[in-house]
Every structure is written in C-alpha cells, then in structure tokens.
Amino acid sequence: MSAPAKRRCRGPAADLDSSFQKRLRKISIEGNIAAGKSTLVRLLEKHSDEWEVIPEPIAKWCNIQTSEDECKELSTSQKSGGNLLQMLYDKPTRWAYTFQTYACLSRVRAQLKPISAKLHEAEHPVQFFERSVYSDRYVFASNLFESGNINETEWAIYQDWHSWLLNQFQSEIELDGIIYLRTTPQKCMERLQKRGRKEEEGIDLEYLENLHYKHETWLYEKTMRVDFENLKEIPILVLDVNEDFKNDKIKQEYLIDEIKSFLTS
C-alpha cells in the first residue's frame, strides 16, 4: 500500500510555514449517504491530538443548529429562511444546481479555514475531511446531471466554475489520500431510515444505488475519468463497513489500525 503523497507547495499559505506544509497530510473520507462517515470522524477525532476532523457542513445547508462552534453561525440561505437540502430533495430539478454550487463553496471555505494552534505544533499532523470538493463534482453533481436534474448548460457552467475555483486554491486544498467507506446501498438505506433526518425522508434506494455506482467507479474500480492530475494517482484506502461499527470496539480498533498504516506505510 503506497503512502499518501506529499502535495506540491505552489505558494506559501498565510498561516502555514513550509515545514508544516510538508508535514501536514490532508485526507478525505468518502462514501455513500449513511455509510458511516460521521461515526468514523468522531472516532478519529478522539484517537489522536495530532488528528483534526473537518465535518461535512450539513448545518449550513439546512435549518439544523448544533452546539458546535462552526455550526452556530447562520448561512446566507438560513438567514433568508431557506433549507437548501430540503429544497433539493423536494424539487431537485429546480434546486440541484443551486445546492451543488453552494455545497462546493462551503467545502472550499472549510478547507481554507486556519489550522488550529494545537495541530500546528503536531509532529505528524493530519486533517480528515468528511467528503471533499471532488466528490461534490464526480459523485453528486454528476449524478444529478445524468438524472436530468441539472441541465447541460448548468453542468457546463458548474464544471468550468469548479475547475477554476479549485485551480485558484490548488496547493491549499489538494488531498494526500482518500479513505473510501465501502458498503452496499441496502445497508445505507437501513442506516438512513434509522437515523431519521427529516431532509432525507424522500431518498429512495435507486438514488443510493446511483451514488454507490459513482463511488465504485471512482474509488474502487478506478475507471472514472477525472480532470485533476493529483486525483489520478492519489492513494486510496478502501474499508469495508457493511457491518455496523458504531458500538463494536474490535471493529473500531481495526479501522483505526488500517488508517494508521495507510498514513505511515
């Protein structure tokens, strides 16, 4: 298994010195809806002071308010009374382009946030992102286009905007590796129904199957065409999480060990 590659430092970030940039590893955790990403990032956050987790900014896409500091500030859509995630599922043809554009923007903002002082002092600092700007495009936006919810003009504009935006911040948002939580669409549906988020009530199995296919061709079979050079050879760790691990200490230890090996081998 190859180690996560070091990113090319094309320019100094305002709050990072070159030594820290060379040490820092940025890893995205990818997977279908309800695959277990949130459960895993909570485990990672507790495991090491040298690991920092950036959760999916779902609170900025809907009317959910949590006690976490990064979720207290209302997004523009919330201030205007909007719940973009709910709007997407209710009227996907109307809101798909709007949602995917805002989702990508919110992820870029999350990845550009200043590094914590504690992580800056770490010998082997790692940032784990719950999904990435790449799955926004190659999984979710692509699926919405193929299902007819994003039209050809919107898709062309989205791809152009996405490529331009990522190229502007390439050195700051490039990933060093991807962890793919692999599970069946049927298992995801079970977990989705169990957690009972209001915005997800309309999700059906076919939608999860389509997202599963996208993840498989991109991260497992590696047959999907991608437009960013760093993605073509990026190290990928595939973890089978079809069996629930939320309350399974043995499975949790196994997953942590696999991730540690991925980071250091």
Curated annotation (Swiss-Prot):
It is found in: Nucleus. GO terms for cellular component: cytoplasm; mitochondrion; nucleus. ATP binds at residues 31-39, 191-195, 243-245. Keywords: ATP-binding, Kinase, Nucleotide-binding, Nucleus, Transferase. InterPro entries: DCK/DGK, Deoxyribonucleoside_kinase, DNK_dom, P-loop_NTPase. Its main location: nucleus. It comes from the Eukaryota. GO terms for molecular function: ATP binding; deoxyadenosine kinase activity; deoxycytidine kinase activity; deoxyguanosine kinase activity; deoxynucleoside kinase activity. It catalyses: 2'-deoxycytidine + a ribonucleoside 5'-triphosphate = dCMP + a ribonucleoside 5'-diphosphate + H(+); 2'-deoxyguanosine + ATP = dGMP + ADP + H(+); 2'-deoxyadenosine + ATP = dAMP + ADP + H(+). Substrate binds at residues 56, 89, 100, 131, 136, 200. Pfam families: dNK. Its EC number is 2.7.1.74, 2.7.1.76, 2.7.1.113. The active site is at 130 (proton acceptor). Gene3D superfamilies: P-loop containing nucleotide triphosphate hydrolases. One of its GO terms (biological process) is deoxyribonucleoside monophosphate biosynthetic process. Phosphorylates the deoxyribonucleosides deoxyadenosine, deoxycytidine and deoxyguanosine. Shows highest activity against deoxyguanosine followed by deoxycytidine and then deoxyadenosine. Shows only very minor activity against deoxyuridine and deoxythymidine. Homodimer. This is Deoxycytidine kinase 2. It comes from Gallus gallus.
